[in-house]
């Protein structure tokens, strides 16, 4: 219920801002061109801002600390491993951070391949062997080398635009049909504003769920490729061993907004369709079969 309430409040805020911008710019919401322009701005705007601020937001979310100078042998090993793998993958040295969490996890983020961040949990450093940890780091390096963060932003922007545009087009038609078109009376050609808002809200919820299935599919798909990238960098057996170790880990404690960036996603979900990560057994089987190594 809380998520639905937050969605409705967010949608209300977006529609208010949306309406204000349309009014200030003089764009008629009944104009398909104007509506598409605003849908593109709102659809891509949030995704691009999130991407540009991703390192700062990620570090704040988990309370991570960037290693400026290694203070002990573990940090020296971590910095050396990241530097070595980044060179192998042909990318610039990412920033390296450690955050306190009991679960075995790590993530990579950043707006560009050559301005990225790799962060690992204390649980990973304490509970994984060096070979297993190397494989996890290689998985994150592969995400960066593959440009997954930018691709996810583009996909999210496209589906956001689709949701905003289609929802409002249908809402506009419904409001005009059910509430009557009052443009001749000097009022908005959107028809009854209450019907418009109600229909747009419901459709955004429905289309938003469908859109999340698309983004979650891509998120799972890129995990298979990052696993394969890790196997190429450090060896298939090391990556398989790392995934097997993840099966014994605590349930991830990272915020839901961070799950798509972590190597270990939450296992519990109503359906695999809404999972950011494939089940660990499927990832292990994909490595053993070499499906994504071809």
Curated annotation (Swiss-Prot):
InterPro entries: HtpX_protease, Pept_M48_protease_HtpX, Peptidase_M48. The active site is at 140. It comes from the Bacteria. Binds 1 zinc ion per subunit. It is a multi-pass membrane protein. It is an enzyme of class 3 (hydrolase). GO terms for cellular component: plasma membrane. One of its GO terms (molecular function) is zinc ion binding. Keywords: Cell inner membrane, Cell membrane, Hydrolase, Membrane, Metal-binding, Metalloprotease, Protease, Transmembrane, Transmembrane helix, Zinc. This is Protease HtpX. It comes from Klebsiella pneumoniae (strain 342). The gene is htpX.
């Amino acid at each position: 219920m809380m998520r639905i309430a937050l969605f409705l409040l967010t949608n209300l805020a977006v529609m208010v801002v949306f309406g204000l911008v349309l009014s200030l710019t003089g764009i008629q919401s009944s104009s398909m061109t104007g509506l598409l322009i605003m849908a593109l701005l709102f659809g891509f705007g949030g995704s691009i801002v999130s991407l540009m601020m991703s390192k700062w937001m990620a570090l704040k979310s988990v309370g991570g600390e960037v290693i400026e100078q290694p203070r002990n042998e573990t940090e020296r090993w971590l910095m050396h491993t990241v530097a070595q793998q980044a060179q192998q993958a042909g990318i610039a040295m990412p920033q390296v951070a450690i955050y306190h969490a009991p679960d075995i996890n790590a993530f990579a983020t950043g707006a560009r391949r050559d301005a990225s961040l790799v962060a690992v949990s204390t649980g990973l450093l304490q509970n994984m062997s060096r070979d297993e940890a190397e494989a996890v780091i290689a998985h994150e390096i592969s995400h960066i080398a593959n440009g997954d963060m930018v691709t996810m932003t583009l996909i999210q922007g496209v589906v956001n635009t689709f949701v905003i545009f289609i929802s409002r087009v249908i809402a506009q038609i419904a409001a005009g049909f059910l509430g009557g078109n009052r443009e001749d009376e000097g009022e908005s050609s959107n028809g009854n504003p209450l019907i418009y808002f109600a229909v747009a809200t419901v459709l955004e919820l429905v289309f938003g769920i469908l859109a999340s299935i698309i983004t979650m599919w891509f998120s799972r798909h890129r995990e298979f490729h990052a696993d394969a990238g890790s196997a190429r960098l450090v060896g298939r057996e090391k990556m398989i061993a790392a995934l097997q170790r993840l099966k014994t880990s605590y349930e991830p404690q990272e915020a839901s907004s961070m799950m798509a960036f972590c190597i270990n996603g939450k296992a519990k979900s109503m359906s695999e369709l809404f999972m950011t990560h494939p089940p660990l057994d499927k990832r292990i089987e994909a490595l053993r079969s070499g499906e994504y190594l071809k």
